């Protein structure tokens, strides 16, 4: 598998500029380059002035978004795995682990003596547990044993369409806490914190990495990745066709194994709690 060739910008460019000032054009040719998350199709280059010219349609190529880029930003030439493709694979993996893996969050409300049913956030998938803040100095949160989660609540009365009804005798005015599972959220920004944004535990990071890896490798056979380099013919005699598919299957097996392990750990951390309900 060849190493991506790189250079850098020597001047800022805005989202509509077609002339790129580069640190080196020795590896540049007509084709695609990547700057940050943007793909750009280059139509020509000038070795004397170390510039490259994008085609009129070249900015924001292959579904990326044209953006401004600053001096010294890395320019990757014909990237094997474009950043946008990697990000999509990561987010596809995050979405695919649900419901085996799920995010956990909490919501609270104050109990009213005349009210038994309360609105819940629309993001709730299932209620994992309910507790309430008991009076006095003990600081104990007592489990609520009688409650009902309604996923099909009347939307005219409850905007989110989800409610919980509490039937235990709880001191009015006390805080009730609902712990619930939800679908993991995808990553959006480059500086997003995995645990904070997705809601998944930090130990699940490698599950997402394996999931993204097998998705990317499934479409590219590493035994044929060197077709753009001078040693292509020699490499083809040493690396059997299909090695990419084999690598993808291996990573898929690792993904499935780690997914099962993390799912078991999550079930152990949040076991099904017995409670009374009404129908």
Regions found by a protein language model. Name each.
Residues 1-14, 27-53, 65-279:
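Glycine-enriched, solvent-exposed interface loops adjoining structured elements
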Residues 57:
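Arg/Lys-rich RNA-binding interfaces used to dock onto structured RNA substrates
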Residues 17-23, 61-62:
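Short alpha-helix capping/helix-loop boundary micro-motifs
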């Amino acid at each position: 598998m060849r190493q991506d060739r790189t250079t850098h910008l020597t001047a800022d460019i805005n989202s509509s500029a077609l002339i790129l000032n580069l640190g080196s054009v020795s590896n540049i040719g007509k084709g695609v380059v990547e700057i940050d998350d943007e793909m750009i199709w280059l139509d020509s280059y000038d070795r004397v002035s170390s510039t490259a010219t994008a085609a009129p349609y070249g900015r924001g190529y292959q579904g990326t978004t044209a953006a401004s880029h600053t001096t010294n930003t890395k320019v990757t030439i014909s990237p094997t795995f474009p950043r946008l493709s990697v990000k999509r694979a990561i987010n596809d993996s995050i979405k695919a682990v649900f419901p085996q893996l799920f995010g956990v969050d909490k919501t609270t409300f104050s109990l009213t003596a005349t009210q038994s049913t309360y609105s819940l956030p629309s993001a709730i998938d299932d209620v994992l547990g309910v507790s309430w803040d008991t009076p006095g100095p003990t600081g104990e949160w007592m489990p609520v044993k009688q409650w009902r989660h309604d996923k099909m609540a009347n939307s005219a009365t409850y905007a989110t369409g989800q409610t919980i009804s509490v039937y235990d005798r709880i001191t009015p005015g006390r805080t009730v806490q609902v712990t619930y599972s939800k679908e993991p959220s995808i990553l959006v920004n480059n500086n997003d914190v995995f645990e904070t944004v997705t809601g998944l535990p930090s130990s699940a990071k490698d599950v997402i990495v394996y999931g993204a890896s097998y998705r990317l490798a499934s479409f590219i056979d590493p035994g044929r990745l060197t077709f753009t380099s001078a040693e292509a013919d020699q490499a083809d005699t040493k690396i059997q066709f299909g090695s990419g598919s084999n690598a993808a299957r291996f990573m898929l097996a690792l993904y499935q194994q780690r997914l099962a392990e993390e799912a078991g750990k999550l079930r152990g951390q949040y076991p099904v709690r017995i409670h009374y309900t009404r129908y």
